[in-house]
Amino acid sequence: MSTHSDSPRAWIRETAVFLTSQMFTLFGSSLVQYAILWYITLETKSGLMVTISAISGFLPAFILSPFAGVWADRYDRKKLIILSDIGIAAATLVLALFLMAGFEALWLMFVLSAVRSVGSGIQTPAINALLPQLVPQEKLTRVNGINYSLQSGLMLVAPVASGALMSMTSLQNLLFIDIITAGVAVAILVLFLHVKPHEKALQQQDSGYFEDLKLGFSYIRQHRFILHFFVFYGIIMFLIAPSAFLTPLQVTRTFSGTYWHLTVIEVVFFVGMLAGGGIMAVWGGMKNRIHTVALSGGVIGVGTLALGVVPTFWGYALFLALIGISIPAYNTPSMVLIQETVDENYMGRVFGVMSMLSSAMMPLGMMFFGPVSDRIAIEWIMIVTGVLVVLLSGGVILDRVLVAAGKQKVPVAVEAEPQEEGSESERH
């Protein structure tokens, strides 16, 4: 069941309202994310403390994502997003009050990171599953491309804004900015976003959480293209960890990098992502989603390989920008593939598993490649992972199940389950 309006102006308005609310949330969250990271880094100068902060920021979301996917299918997704925003803002307010009272213990920062991770874990499947309720299927790629451009633009501005604010005011004042932006986002959703709950949310929920979770994994297992895609997606996320996290260290070692060099590589990467999102919004990708995923994945692999061999800093920055351009071209069709082909009543659970993969595989990659980078040159890591990404992306074209799924434009239903309503549709 599609819940978006048939009126062109109506769906555009509702989508604009939703994306605007998400931009407010993302901006405030990004300010706090950078502020907490830099505060811990400058106060402790400890790699262990930074690692604990990173773990507290991703582990709760990883653990919660599958259950959050169940909630996104059982309940009103708009309300889930609103409640998680309110919860994050409340936790941020508590920390701000502690700081104002003179308590500056590091464990408070870790607790806040964990609470924010819980909120993110709850709302991410709901956000990804709500968008197809607002946007006509044929417009999903372009809208996701626009969304990536907006997010990239904010991620370009956020570290600069956070650094400027941290130099002019206290951490607790910056936390209040996040609370205000969260309040604005919630107000926009409550007052201006009008979207009906999806079909399953309107039904009486007779099954338990774990039964629904089991049905979600059963759905993934029954539809081979989802299983194949998640295996590919997870391996790619693991392999691109070096190009995502080790570039500052590589620039410092190879090009005797300064703060200026590190700023340049951050800027060119996010400018590339901004451009890539715009390209996807205009182009829309190939007719087959998997072909676009394979092409962009191959370009990411070539760019990563080039980071290991390019002799000059500006050449390095150029290939990093190329990777940035390719990220939205990879992520957008990946997201749309799920949004187009998965049954609406299972979309939250499928996105929950996808969120679990995205929140786990890159940190796992860093846990492996980080120590390795202290033993061998990062250039070799980039070369090897780049080659593997190219080969894996090329191999996707040979997967008939995935290629066939890339052509589909209608959701596939789950095989009839006696415990689950709304799944009488014939399986494709």
Task: For each feature predicted by the language model, list its residue ranges.
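Juxtamembrane intracellular "pre-TM" segments in multi-pass secondary transporters
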Residues: 2-15, 195-231, 415-420
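Helix-loop boundary and gating motifs at the non-cytosolic
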Residues: 4-60, 218-269
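Hydrophobic alpha-helical transmembrane segments
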Residues: 16, 51-52, 82, 107-111, ...
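Substrate-agnostic recognition of the 12-TM MFS/MFS-like secondary transporter fold
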Residues: 16-33, 56-70, 76-91, 108-166, ...
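Transmembrane alpha-helix termini and helix-breaking/packing motifs in multi-pass membrane transporters
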Residues: 37-43, 96-101, 157-177, 253-254, ...
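Helix-breaking motifs and short loop linkers at transmembrane-helix boundaries and internal kinks
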Residues: 44, 76, 98-100, 310-311
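C-terminal transmembrane bundle of multi-pass solute transporters/carriers
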Residues: 63, 74, 80, 94, ...
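Helix-loop junctions on the cytosolic side of multi-pass membrane transporters
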Residues: 129, 133, 175-206, 397-411
